[in-house]
Amino acid sequence: MNEKTARQIAEMKNQTIGVEVEMNSITRQKAAKVAAAYFGTGRYENTAGRNGYSTWSAWDAQGREWKFQKDVSIAGPDEQKCELVTPILTYGDIETLQELCRQLRHAGAKSDASRGCGVHIHIGAQGHTPQSLRNLANIMASHESLIAEALKLDRSRMSRYCRTVDPRFLEQRSEERRVGKEC
C-alpha cells in the first residue's frame, strides 16, 4: 500500500458520522431498554420533554446518548414508529452500531422499504476540503443507482425522502473548481 492510500485510510477511520435507522414493530421505550441492556448500563428514560418527538434515550458506557424518536414517515401504529438516532460515531463504533441493530431486530424491530423505513448517514465536515467534498459527492453520485438497485429502494420514497445528488450541484462544483484554478 502506498503512502497516500495509507493516509487516506487513516483519515477515513477518523471520519465522524451520525446514523439514523428507521424501524417499526418495536416501541421506542422497548428499543431504548434493549439498547441500555446491550450497552451494559441499564440506563434508559423518556426524554421527550428535552428532545421532543416522543423520544426515549439510552446511554452507553461512554455516557453518549442514543435516541429512539418518533418518525411519522414510518408505516404502522404511532407507538411503533421508531428511529434510532446515534450520537456522533467514528469507525471504531461501527461494530457497536451493527450489534445494536442485531439486538433490536432480535427484539422484534423490522426495517425495510415496505415499512417506510430507511437509513440516513450524516458525514462530519471536520477535516474536509472543498476538493474532498467534491470527491465525496462525485463518488456518491456515481454509485447511487447501484446502491438503489442493490437495496431495492422504493422509487417514490427516493423522490420524496432520499433524493439523489442533483446533477446541477455537481456541475456547479466542477465549474467552481475550474474558475478557482484559473484565478
Residue ranges: model-predicted function:
Residues Y44, D112, S145-R163:
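Flexible helix-coil linker/hinge segments at domain or subdomain boundaries
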Residues D112-H128:
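Histidine-centered divalent-metal-coordination microenvironment in nucleic-acid enzymes
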Residues S25, I88-T90, I123-G127, R155:
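Active-site-proximal loop/turn and secondary-structure-junction residues that shape catalytic pockets
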Residues T5-K13, K152, S156-S174:
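Extended intrinsically disordered terminal tails
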Residues G49-D60, I123, L153-R163:
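Short proline/glycine- and acidic-rich turn/helix-capping motifs at secondary-structure junctions
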Residues A37, I94-C101, Q126-L151:
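Helical (often loop-to-helix) elements that flank the catalytic cores of nucleotide-handling enzymes
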Residues E176-C183:
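Conserved small/polar residues in nucleotide/adenosyl-binding loops
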Residues M1-A107:
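Terminal catalytic/cofactor-binding subdomain
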